[in-house]
Amino acid sequence: MIYQVVLLLLVSPAPVSAAGCNPDCTGIQCGWPRCPGGQNPVMDKCVSCCPFCPPKSAQG
């Protein structure tokens, strides 16, 4: 019974973090993009480990 409780404690945080995003971007080297229209790059580790230009629908 104790092993089941410990296993649940170890496994339960995994789905929570996987559903949110994956912030583990260690060892990845990124550049800084130049976005069209003077937009600032977006930093969202739930989408990408590297900064990226916002979609055109978000620019207007």
Swiss-Prot record:
Q: Which UniProt keywords apply?
A: Disulfide bond, Ion channel impairing toxin, Neurotoxin, Potassium channel impairing toxin, Secreted, Signal, Toxin, Voltage-gated potassium channel impairing toxin, Voltage-gated sodium channel impairing toxin
- The residues the entry assigns to the signal sequence are 1-19
* Organs and tissues of expression: Expressed by the venom gland.
Where in the cell? Secreted
Q: How is the polypeptide modified once translated?
A: Contains 4 disulfide bonds.
Q: Name one GO cellular component term.
A: extracellular region
Entry GO MF terms: potassium channel regulator activity; sodium channel regulator activity; toxin activity
Quote the function comment for this protein.
Answer: Insect-specific toxin. Blocks voltage-gated potassium and sodium channels.
Protein name per UniProt = Insect toxin mu-NPTX-Nc1a
Q: What is the lineage of its organism?
A: Eukaryota, Metazoa, Ecdysozoa, Arthropoda, Chelicerata
